[in-house]
């Protein structure tokens, strides 16, 4: 079989795989990925893949362990079926927050996942907005680390005027937020969280001028959404005209959607690296943008051995 692209998908996000395939002018290749009655995962690639350039679209989001196991079994099946190269397209990299030893006698889970990928035969990884960029160093294979910035920047430019300030919800996100502020030529503010005395509630202080401006909180992911929602309240208390939020990965676990619904946020913009649950889909404040065109462009460049560096913005 000639060296052609084949797009595959597990059960994590088939809609994203369909969108990517549509941008590439093809359909997702057929694979049977299901569970046995005892919970074991079964994978069967239904068509010949010998000599093909295979891309598996599978964010390792909730249920993270099922989706991770589906991915590694699909890779093994494709490798044994003689695919020429297998690329794991993992828009959301589960376990990314466990990227270092934060306490004695704990694993570095993000490294373990990387070792699993390489052990089963992944030859390249395509991911987006890693929680910790140094995860790229856990791999001994090429990692193309894309950013959702082009998609989010386009939305911000379209929806908001010039009276905007970009806000980092914590000190750790300053570099990301500064990059957005620079591209948009806007101001930058930071929310500093600290306890002034032991046993006191955490206080939130705004560093920067937000008074009378549209404040846009930026983060790489929203899990329980507590930081974002509390940040919105603090910004309004400091004189912001209104508050919006943007993030790449809508993890949205536990009380997240309820918090967003009841928060001071006017809107909460996310991308489709992770599929939204029904509760999130029905929340009028949450808007989802697609990164499928960006991923499709990267896949095409990788297949054609073209440079992907222009996408790293």
Curated annotation (Swiss-Prot):
Involved in the biosynthesis of the central metabolite phospho-alpha-D-ribosyl-1-pyrophosphate (PRPP) via the transfer of pyrophosphoryl group from ATP to 1-hydroxyl of ribose-5-phosphate (Rib-5-P). Pathway: Metabolic intermediate biosynthesis; 5-phospho-alpha-D-ribose 1-diphosphate biosynthesis; 5-phospho-alpha-D-ribose 1-diphosphate from D-ribose 5-phosphate (route I): step 1/1. It catalyses: D-ribose 5-phosphate + ATP = 5-phospho-alpha-D-ribose 1-diphosphate + AMP + H(+). It is an enzyme of class 2 (transferase). Its cofactor is Mg(2+). One of its GO terms (biological process) is ribonucleoside monophosphate biosynthetic process. Its EC number is 2.7.6.1. Keywords: ATP-binding, Cytoplasm, Kinase, Magnesium, Metal-binding, Nucleotide biosynthesis, Nucleotide-binding, Transferase. Belongs to the ribose-phosphate pyrophosphokinase family. Class I subfamily. InterPro entries: PRib_PP_synth_CS, Pribosyltran_N, PRibTrfase_dom, PRTase-like, Rib-P_diPkinase, Rib-P_diPkinase_bac. It comes from Desulfotalea psychrophila (strain LSv54 / DSM 12343). Mg(2+) 2 binds at residue 170. The active site is at residue 193. GO terms for cellular component: cytoplasm; ribose phosphate diphosphokinase complex. ATP binds at residues 38-40, 97-98. Binds 2 Mg(2+) ions per subunit. D-ribose 5-phosphate binds at residues 195, 219, 223-227. It comes from the Bacteria. PANTHER family: RIBOSE-PHOSPHATE DIPHOSPHOKINASE FAMILY MEMBER, RIBOSE-PHOSPHATE PYROPHOSPHOKINASE 1, CHLOROPLASTIC. The keyword Nucleotide-binding applies. Homohexamer. It is found in: Cytoplasm. This is Ribose-phosphate pyrophosphokinase. Mg(2+) 1 binds at residue 131. The keyword Metal-binding applies. One of its GO terms (molecular function) is ribose phosphate diphosphokinase activity.
């Amino acid at each position: 079989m000639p060296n052609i692209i084949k797009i595959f998908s597990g059960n994590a996000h088939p809609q994203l795989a369909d969108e990517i395939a549509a941008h590439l002018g093809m359909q997702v290749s057929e694979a049977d990925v299901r569970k046995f009655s005892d919970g074991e995962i079964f994978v069967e690639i239904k068509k010949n893949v010998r000599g093909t350039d295979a891309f598996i679209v599978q964010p390792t989001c909730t249920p993270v362990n099922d989706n991770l196991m589906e991915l590694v079994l699909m890779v093994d099946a494709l490798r044994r079926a003689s695919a020429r190269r297998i690329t794991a397209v993992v828009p959301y990299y589960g376990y990314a927050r466990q990227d270092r030893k934060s306490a004695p006698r704990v694993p570095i889970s993000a490294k373990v996942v990387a070792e699993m990928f390489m052990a089963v035969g992944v030859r390249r990884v395509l991911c987006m907005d890693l929680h910790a960029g140094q995860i790229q160093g856990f791999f001994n294979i090429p990692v193309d680390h894309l950013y959702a910035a082009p998609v989010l920047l386009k939305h911000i430019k379209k929806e908001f005027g010039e009276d905007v300030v970009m806000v980092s919800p914590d000190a750790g996100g300053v570099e990301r937020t500064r990059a957005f502020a620079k591209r948009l030529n806007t101001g930058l503010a930071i929310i500093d969280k600290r306890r002034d005395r032991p046993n006191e509630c955490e206080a939130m202080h705004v560093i920067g001028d937000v008074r009378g401006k549209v404040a846009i909180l930026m983060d790489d992911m929203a899990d329980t959404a507590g930081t974002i929602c509390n940040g919105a309240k603090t910004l309004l208390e400091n004189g912001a005209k209104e508050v919006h939020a943007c993030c790449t990965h809508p993890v949205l676990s536990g009380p997240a959607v309820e918090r967003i619904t009841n928060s001071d946020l006017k809107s909460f913009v996310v991308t489709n690296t992770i599929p939204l649950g029904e509760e999130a889909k029905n929340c009028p404040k949450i808007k989802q943008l697609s990164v499928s065109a960006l991923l499709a462009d990267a896949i095409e460049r990788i297949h054609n051995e073209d440079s992907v560096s222009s996408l790293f913005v």
